[in-house]
């Protein structure tokens, strides 16, 4: 979010307008914060915790993408690759939360089948709903009260910095967290 102070401001303004600055943010507030939800969806697309799906095992000889996959082969889906595939996403290298919004600013109800930050099918993350709600509450509370920026003299990190093995391991950063002055 250091790259996008305008989105930090948009989260703040949305929360200020639709929830307020005093009361505790609740799960029900998710419905009145489409911009925040779109920002979280785009963040999940670009920086999923897991780069690969959990393992799957083929039960029959099959093929995919022109490759033969014998029965009993362990298969991992490259979720990172899917989230950056230009055949699925317009300008996948760009942070574009607007891709998740309708023309009227409401959040799109249907998510594309190639959006898989929590995997899919029988191996989908069992805590997906809880994780999304916690991330919403943490994000809205944080940006309602603070702004985050790069530390002076520090190079702004790249959007794809970090090491992916089975999970994302972002590098350490020096940041500045500034308390907002509420008007």
Can you say where each PLM-predicted feature lies in the sequence?
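Central I-helix of cytochrome P450 enzymes
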Residues: 1-16, 43, 70-78, 116-117, ...
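Cytochrome P450 heme-binding "Cys pocket" and the immediately downstream C-terminal segment
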Residues: 5-8, 12, 128-166
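Conserved cytochrome P450 K-helix E-x-x-R motif and the immediately C-terminal K′/meander segment
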Residues: 25-66
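Beta-strand cores of modular interaction/reader domains in eukaryotic scaffold and signaling proteins
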Residues: 34, 63, 68-70, 74-78, ...
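Conserved cytochrome P450 K-helix/beta-meander segment immediately N-terminal to the heme-binding cysteine loop
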Residues: 61, 77-106
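Cytochrome P450 heme-thiolate "Cys pocket" and heme-binding signature region
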Residues: 65, 102-135, 161-163
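C-terminal helix/juxtamembrane-tail motif
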Residues: 73-74, 80, 164-183
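Conserved beta-strand elements of beta-rich interaction domains across eukaryotes
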Residues: 74, 81-83, 122-123, 137, ...
